[in-house]
C-alpha cells in the first residue's frame, strides 16, 4: 500500500505523463514533509522554466508563492489583491487581511525596522535577508 506522499508523487507523475501545456496544482504539497515539498516545488519550477508550462498553484503555504510571477490573494472567495510576489508578500497588513502571515524573512525585516535597524529592501528569502544584513553593517 502506498503512503500519502507516494500517492501524491504517483498522481503528479501521471499528470506529467500527459504533457499538458497548463498545469493547475491545488495544494500540491499539502500532505508532504518538508523534503517532499521542496522536491515537488523544484519539479514545478523546472516545468515552468525549462519546459515552458503555464503553472497555476493554489496554496496556503505563503513561502510557496515567493517564486511566482504573479500572486493573487484571495480571502472568503474574493480576490483582494494581485501583483508580483514581492509586491504582495512584503505587505504584512495585506497578508493579514487575507488571513495569512508574512514569510519569516519579511517578518524579520519589520521586526528589525521596529527595533531601529533599517535594511535597504524587504527580503523574501533567507538568502536575501542575509545579503541585506551584511550590506547594512
Which residue stretches match the model-derived regions?
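Catalytic Walker B motif of ABC-type/P-loop ATPase nucleotide-binding domains
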Residues: 23-26
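ABC ATPase nucleotide-binding domains
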Residues: 95-137
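Conserved catalytic motifs of ABC-family nucleotide-binding domains
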Residues: 19
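Helix N-cap at the start of a conserved alpha-helix in ABC-type nucleotide-binding domains
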Residues: 34-36
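Hydrophobic anchor residue at the start of the ABC signature
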Residues: 12
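ABC ATPase "signature
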Residues: 82-83
Amino acid at each position: 500500500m502506498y503512503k500519502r506522499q507516494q500517492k501524491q508523487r504517483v498522481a503528479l507523475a501521471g499528470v506529467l505523463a500527459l504533457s499538458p501545456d497548463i498545469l493547475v496544482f491545488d495544494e500540491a504539497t499539502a500532505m508532504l514533509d518538508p523534503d517532499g515539498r521542496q522536491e515537488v516545488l523544484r519539479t514545478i519550477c523546472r516545468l515552468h522554466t525549462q519546459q515552458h508550462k503555464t503553472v497555476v498553484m493554489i496554496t496556503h503555504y505563503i513561502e510557496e508563492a515567493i517564486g511566482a510571477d504573479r500572486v493573487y490573494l484571495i480571502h472568503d472567495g474574493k480576490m483582494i489583491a494581485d501583483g508580483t510576489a514581492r509586491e504582495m508578500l512584503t505587505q504584512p497588513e495585506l497578508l493579514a487581511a487575507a488571513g495569512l502571515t508574512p514569510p519569516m524573512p519579511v517578518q524579520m525585516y519589520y521586526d528589525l525596522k521596529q527595533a531601529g535597524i533599517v535594511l535597504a529592501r524587504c527580503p523574501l528569502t533567507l538568502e536575501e535577508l542575509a545579503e541585506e544584513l551584511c550590506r547594512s553593517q
